């Protein structure tokens, strides 16, 4: 999808932030609770916070909006830090159920790729005959 260094974000129940160098080598990554898990954790593990149904606000003034906004800010901040740390014109690829919502609040260039895992598998499958013909195997 890109030959640039890349931050790959899968935003679902958990949010994974993985980094690849320009040659496609995995450098490392992070796992965060997803947006819904963050909300549910606050509701279950605090004495008085509700299961928030708030909306994102730049400066929230009620508890529900503060919880919803805090989750988005945490996700966006972790993603943006990974892109800055990777440097060298890193590309950010977003996928998963919360990708659109998080993407709206990122201050970095990004590309949304629906079904990123399937896209990657298809690309790998397309490379398999060439890899086997040249004698490369993963065993």
Spans of features found by a protein language model:
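Adenine-nucleotide phosphate-binding core of ATP-dependent small-molecule kinases
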Residues: 56-91, 98-101, 109-110
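A generic "binding-loop/recognition-motif" signal
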Residues: 13, 98, 117
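Short active-site-adjacent structural elements
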Residues: 17, 101-105
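ATP/nucleoside-binding phosphotransfer catalytic cores, i.e., glycine-rich phosphate-binding loops
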Residues: 94-97, 115, 131, 136-139
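Conserved, helical-rich catalytic subdomain that frames metal- and/or nucleotide-binding sites
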Residues: 46, 50-54, 61-62
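Conserved phosphate-binding/catalytic loops in two-lobed NTP-binding clefts
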Residues: 107-122
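Conserved phosphate-binding catalytic cores of ATP/NTP-utilizing and phosphoryl-transfer enzymes
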Residues: 1-6, 122-131
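Phosphate-binding/catalytic loop of phosphoryl-transfer enzymes
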Residues: 1-45, 72-83, 136
């Amino acid at each position: 999808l890109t030959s640039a260094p890349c931050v790959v974000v899968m935003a679902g129940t958990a949010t994974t932030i993985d980094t690849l160098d320009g040659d496609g080598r995995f450098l490392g990554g992070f796992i965060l609770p997803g947006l819904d898990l963050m909300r549910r954790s606050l509701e279950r593990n605090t004495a008085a916070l509700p299961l928030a149904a708030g909306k994102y606000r730049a400066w929230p003034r009620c508890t529900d909006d503060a919880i919803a906004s805090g989750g988005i800010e945490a996700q966006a901040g972790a993603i943006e830090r990974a892109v800055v740390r990777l440097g060298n014109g890193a590309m950010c690829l977003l996928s998963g159920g919360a990708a659109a919502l998080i993407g709206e609040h990122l201050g970095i260039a990004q590309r949304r790729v629906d079904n990123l895992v399937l896209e990657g598998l298809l690309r790998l499958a397309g490379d398999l005959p060439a890899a086997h013909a040249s004698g490369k195997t993963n065993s």
